[in-house]
Regions:
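Conserved, mostly hydrophobic/aromatic
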Residues: 14, 35, 115, 171, ...
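Active-site beta->alpha loop and helix N-cap motifs at the rims of alpha/beta catalytic domains
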Residues: 47-164, 171, 178-182
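Terminal or standalone catalytic/regulatory effector modules within metabolic enzymes
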Residues: 36-54, 285-291, 295, 299-466
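Acidic, compositionally biased tether/linker regions
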Residues: 442-547, 632
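Catalytic cores of alpha/beta
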Residues: 154-159, 208-221
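Glycine-rich phosphate-binding active-site loops on the catalytic face of alpha/beta enzymes
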Residues: 115, 175, 221-238
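Active-site mouth loops of central-metabolism enzymes
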Residues: 10-30, 81-97, 116-119, 142-155, ...
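Structured functional modules or segments
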Residues: 517-632
Length: 632
């Protein structure tokens, strides 16, 4: 029996599960050379939510991150997680985009592609598999493990055979919710070894605490590889600690052969990063122990807590946890893994926060119910289906959802224009258009400012000298604060930094600037979330106020450049879409509750909103029966 090999998940799934994927590349770089010396089977370094959060929260280029990690780990394979037809996004992408993305990821440093589909629908894996085999990388087909009346050992084996037929080099049992038990693990690994005959890779989140025992039983049953994380990013929603597994298997025939001393040096580094970032340790609470009921994965748990905090509703976490399995059963028992974890979890949040189950439904949930994510594992509640689907077109179950996406690389390249300087930039835009456009615009502006400053400095006389570093600091302040323009006057000199699309700032106020300080400046304030108007007396009591059911961003149109869903004077029908509120990474259609006329659109496009912010006022056709704004 061969020794058990280990893959490190610290900088991908470990931080996604415990730190909401907020680890920066600066946190990683100093320790990567030591991690490269360990002798891991691979380091999981990319994919999952890391691509998204680089752009949304960390102001990092995910492609640059990958290249930097590769440069520091030349002796260790790098692995990434792909969501199949969703790649690292939350919707399906065309075959061409899948192929280009896989090829670019391999070119920039990825050696192992772990590919899963949230529904275990093999049709959503085909494009990834063919692209991986074409570029000569390692294709690890992953099975989304879950427990439900429709998920059986036979169904998992059938899917494993389909992955093998696509050319899988190894099979991952992906237990994202920590639902495996030691003896379930043993049975599954033995069955896969006997019937599939590929190396088995066990991925088991700690959550309820059984993962270390699962890994030991998997080794005894013949598993080849297991996932672990460095102790400061282990336990709780994450994975078992690598130090624990290495010590547990020492002097056995499964001995990993890894150096515990080196592993502890690495964990001491991560402990300092944890303290510096004020991140909590991974622990298993009573809520975690209830995983065998709610089945919420580690990464989903941390993001759910984060999103409830944004909604100012963290005190309702227990209610949401109780609602999740109910929603899951109603929509056919999808495994709770991205994107289904977000879709089901967000629906549970809406059901709890609004107090009216299924009154608000995200576009993504509607698409799933209509078949656009793939085939549901089990039957759905037909009353829910009828309520959600309405007049929407349901996809023929014999049609693979990916075939409907025909967007070409050339079309995307034309859309993003000169902002994209490489194939990777266009792919970034393909996956996250709004975030990529914002990121690329900002950084192209910075590059232009640097160029102009260099040109200016070469032509400036000594007596007219301007401190270029001071100006760069102003640019940084403008970028980070989101203001339109910063103007500073010092000793008769006037410096203005204006961001793209900004209006002119008010006249500058002279200030005294110490040489070592950041210049004080008069700035236009960043946008605040819209709030309810103080006085509704000017509006008839019969008008119905449509309010935001959640904290998020108001969008008046389905996409940039398209006409708004409705405008003042439009007739609307019951259940007609009025706008979108983006929250928790999902686009949530807000609909009219009744027939009427739009009398007021309260917000500009892309305005942040709080719970209860007025969005529209609608005059019902039967005004005497209408609900007034004070009771909406």
């Amino acid at each position: 029996m061969a020794k058990l090999q280990l893959m490190d998940t610290t900088i991908r799934d470990g931080q996604q599960s415990l730190w909401a994927t907020r680890m920066s590349i600066g946190d990683m770089l100093p320790i990567l050379p030591k991690m490269d010396r360990v002798g891991y089977w691979a380091i999981e370094a990319w994919g999952g939510a890391t691509f998204d959060t680089c752009l949304r929260f960390l102001d990092e280029n995910p492609w640059d991150r990958l290249r930097l990690i590769k440069s520091k780990t030349p002796n260790t394979r790098l692995s990434m997680l792909s969501r199949g037809q969703n790649l690292v996004g939350y919707k399906h992408y065309s075959r061409e985009i899948c192929f280009r993305f896989i090829e670019a990821a391999h070119r920039n440093g990825i050696d192992v592609f772990r590919v899963f589909d949230a529904l275990n629908d093999i049709r959503n894996v085909v494009d990834n598999a063919e692209a991986i085999k074409e570029c000569g990388a390692h294709f690890e087909g992953a099975i989304s493990y879950t427990v439900s009346p429709v998920h059986t050992l036979d169904s998992f084996l059938e899917y494993g055979q389909q992955l093998k037929d696509l050319g899988a080099d190894s099979i991952a049992i992906k237990d994202m919710a920590g639902m495996l038990t030691p003896y379930r693990t043993e049975r599954i690994v033995k069955a896969f070894n006997a019937e599939i005959g590929l190396p088995i890779h066990v991925h088991c989140h700690y959550v309820g605490g059984m993962a270390p025992a699962n890994i030991i039983k998997s080794a005894e049953a013949g598993a080849a590889i297991a996932d672990t994380a460095s102790a400061p990013l282990a336990f709780g929603n994450s994975h078992p600690a690598v130090e624990m597994i290495v010590a547990a298997l020492e002097e056995s025939r499964y001995d990993t052969g890894l150096d515990l001393g080196l592993l502890f040096e690495i964990s001491e580094y991560w402990e300092e990063v944890r303290k510096r970032g004020h991140y909590k340790r991974g622990v298993s609470s009573l809520t975690h122990m209830k995983v065998y009921s709610h089945q919420v994965p580690g990464g989903m748990m941390s993001n759910l807590v984060s999103q409830l905090e944004i909604q100012n509703a963290l005190d309702r976490l227990d209610e949401v946890m109780e609602e999740i399995p109910r929603v899951r059963a109603e929509v056919g028992y999808p495994p709770l893994v991205t994107p289904m974890s977000q879709i089901v979890g967000t629906q549970a949040v809406f059901n709890v926060l609004t107090g009216k189950r299924w009154s608000v439904v995200s576009k993504e949930m509607k698409d799933y119910i209509c078949g656009y994510y793939g085939k549901a594992p089990g039957p759905m509640d037909q009353e829910i289906v009828a309520k959600v689907v309405g007049d929407s077109q349901v996809l023929d179950p014999d049609v693979a959802p990916g075939l409907l996406v025909t967007t070409t690389f050339a079309e995307l390249e034309e859309e993003i224009g000169d902002l994209a300087k490489s194939e990777e930039d266009v792919l970034m835009y393909a996956l996250f258009p709004n975030e990529a456009r914002t990121y690329l615009s900002k950084h192209r502006t910075s590059e232009k400012v640097d160029f102009l400053l260099e040109e200016e400095s070469s032509q400036t006389k000594e007596e007219d000298y301007v401190d270029i570093n001071q100006i760069r600091e102003l640019v940084r302040v403008a970028e980070e604060s989101g203001v339109g323009e910063i103007v500073v006057e010092e000793e008769g000199a006037r410096i203005s930094v204006r961001m793209p699309g900004a209006m002119c700032a008010a006249p500058a106020v002279p200030v005294a600037v110490p040489a070592e300080a950041v210049p004080a400046a008069q700035v236009a304030p960043a946008a605040e979330p819209a709030a309810a108007p103080a006085d509704n007396a000017s509006r008839p009591a019969s008008w119905h106020c449509v309010t935001a059911p959640m904290v998020g961003t108001f969008y008046a149109a389905p996409a940039p450049g398209e006409p708004p869903f409705v405008k003042v004077g439009d007739e609307v029908t019951a259940n007609q879409t009025l706008c979108i509120v983006e929250a928790m990474k999902l686009m949530n259609e807000i609909t009219s509750e009744e027939m009427g006329v739009v009398r007021e659109v309260c917000l500009e496009d892309a305005t942040p909103v709080e719970f209860g912010t007025p969005l529209f006022y609608i005059e019902p056709h039967n005004s005497h029966d209408a609900i007034g704004p004070e009771s909406a």
